[in-house]
């Protein structure tokens, strides 16, 4: 979130700047009169901020609770990828309750109404939630990187490894948020004004630039570089294996041209060029979450760097609206997960007719799977001459054996009947 902070400059009077200290929206406190010691807000813009914050808070709570409900409903079958999604939803809920909600209340009251301890805690929690959400996303990308690029080492994974990565994300968020609790405190907005707020005075002025760059590197640039490396490696590995599979297929067709004449051969559907569909789906899911993260946060950090070199951007309504995109990230992550896992949504549908439809779809899928397996077996039998001759030989042998057994079993019965008939006639 953002809160206006005063920076002591060389000019006679101080001025208020919007600066990123939370997870979503900056407040619009600024001086209309440079000779005034009290900031005046743009109330129209504040109302827009409050409306957007309230909407984002509601959507973040509802959407992430839906994801948690789906995952907890399937808690006995939760896979490693879903564990990361579970904690990402928890992080987004922390963003909603400890970042968006305090900022919403703060915008309504204009001044922070709690004490110094609560001021430091809220500021710490706001940054903690942001770091946690970001670094859980990074650990998810690292896990997909190991699964795709290093499959042999990935074979030995245990649930403990997943929990270790999640613990690392929590530890990084805990440590990186400490400066926020040190800098902010309840103090006078302007010395001698008698107005107290959860505030920070950056003295000298270069401390503000240093802290802004610290947040930029820790929360955006370094995570983006890690995400680019992991997904660049994943894309290259998938492309290389796809190319190798195509080359191998061409070589096989060149060496054994008669195989190209086979009919009725159905390819396996649970894997694509050595990767399972579930693994590829998890890669697509993580990639979508990362792209959304970049889209939501890039305008904010670009504006922050711009603000460091151009102070006239402060109070610009257009810039504030652009910065509102950052809070959408906690709302969009659940949508992405549910879109990529539509079959899980039916697990929590309360309507019996919808559940019946789910069962019918599952039965149809199972029938198609079984029929596909039978067709595949039949195609293998009909496409191989050796199998055809072997199956015919076995069936002929069984038919001859059955006739022999029938003749052997029917002969004594016929003889016995003849004896009985002869006895009666005599």
From Swiss-Prot:
UniProt cross-references to InterPro entries, sorted A to Z: GPCR_Rhodpsn (IPR000276), GPCR_Rhodpsn_7TM (IPR017452), Vasoprsn_rcpt (IPR001817)
Region (Disordered): 373-426
Tissue distribution: Present in various peripheral tissues with highest expression in branchia and vas deferens. Very low expression detected in nervous system.
Any one annotated GO CC term: plasma membrane
Record bears the keyword GTP-binding: no
Gene Ontology biological process terms from the UniProt entry: cellular response to hormone stimulus; G protein-coupled receptor signaling pathway; positive regulation of hormone secretion
Biased composition (Basic and acidic residues): 375-399
One Gene Ontology MF term: vasopressin receptor activity
Cytoplasmic compartment residues: 73-84, 142-165, 230-288, 341-426
Family note: Belongs to the G-protein coupled receptor 1 family. Vasopressin/oxytocin receptor subfamily.
Residues listed as glycosylation sites in the UniProt record: 32, 35
Entries under Pfam families matching the protein: 7tm_1
Protein known as: Cephalotocin receptor 2
Biased composition regions of type Polar residues, renumbered to the chain: 402-426
Segments in the Extracellular topological domain: 1-51, 106-120, 187-208, 310-319
Summary of the function given for this chain in its UniProt record: Acts as a receptor for cephalotocin.
This protein's UniProt keywords: Cell membrane, Disulfide bond, G-protein coupled receptor, Glycoprotein, Membrane, Receptor, Transducer, Transmembrane, Transmembrane helix
Disulfide bonds: 119-198
């Amino acid at each position: 979130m953002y809160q206006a902070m005063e920076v002591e400059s060389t000019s006679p009077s101080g001025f208020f700047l919007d600066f990123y200290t939370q997870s979503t929206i900056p407040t619009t406190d600024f001086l209309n009169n440079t000779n005034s010691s009290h900031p005046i807000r743009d109330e129209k813009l504040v109302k827009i901020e409050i409306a957007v914050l309230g909407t984002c808070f509601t959507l973040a709570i509802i959407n992430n609770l839906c994801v948690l409900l789906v995952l907890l409903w399937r808690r006995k079958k939760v896979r490693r990828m879903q564990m990361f999604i579970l904690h990402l939803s928890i992080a987004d809920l922390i963003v909603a309750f400890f970042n968006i909600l305090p900022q919403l209340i703060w915008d309504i009251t204009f001044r922070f109404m709690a004490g110094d301890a609560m001021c430091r805690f809220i500021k710490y929690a706001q940054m903690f939630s942001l770091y946690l959400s970001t670094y859980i996303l990074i650990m998810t990308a690292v896990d997909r990187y190991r699964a795709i690029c290093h499959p042999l080492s990935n074979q030995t994974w245990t649930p403990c490894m997943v929990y270790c990565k999640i613990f690392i994300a929590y530890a990084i968020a805990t440590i990186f948020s400490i400066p926020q609790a040190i800098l902010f405190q309840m103090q006078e907005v302007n010395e001698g004004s008698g107005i107290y707020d959860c505030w920070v005075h950056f003295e000298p002025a270069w401390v503000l630039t240093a802290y802004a760059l610290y947040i930029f590197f820790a929360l955006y640039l370094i995570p983006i570089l890690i995400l680019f490396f992991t997904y660049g490696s994943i894309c290259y590995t998938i492309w290389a294996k796809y190319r190798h599979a195509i080359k191998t297929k061409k070589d096989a067709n060149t060496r054994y041209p008669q195989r190209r004449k086979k009919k009725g051969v159905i390819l396996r559907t649970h894997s694509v060029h050595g990767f399972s569909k579930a693994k590829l789906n998890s890669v697509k899911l993580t990639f979508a979450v990362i792209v959304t993260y970049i889209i939501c946060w890039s305008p904010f950090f670009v504006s922050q760097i711009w603000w460091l070199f151009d102070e006239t951007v402060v109070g610009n309504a257009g810039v504030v609206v652009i910065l509102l995109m950052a809070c959408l990230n906690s709302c969009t992550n659940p949508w992405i997960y549910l879109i990529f896992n539509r079959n899980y949504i039916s697990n929590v549908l309360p309507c019996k007719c919808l559940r019946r439809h789910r069962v019918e779809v599952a039965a149809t899928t199972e029938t198609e799977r079984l029929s596909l397996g039978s067709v595949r077996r039949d195609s293998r039998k009909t496409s191989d001459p050796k199998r055809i001759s072997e199956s015919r030989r076995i069936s002929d042998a069984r038919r001859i054996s059955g006739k022999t057994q029938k003749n052997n079993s029917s002969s004594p019965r016929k003889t016995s009947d003849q004896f009985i008939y002869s006895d009666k006639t005599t």
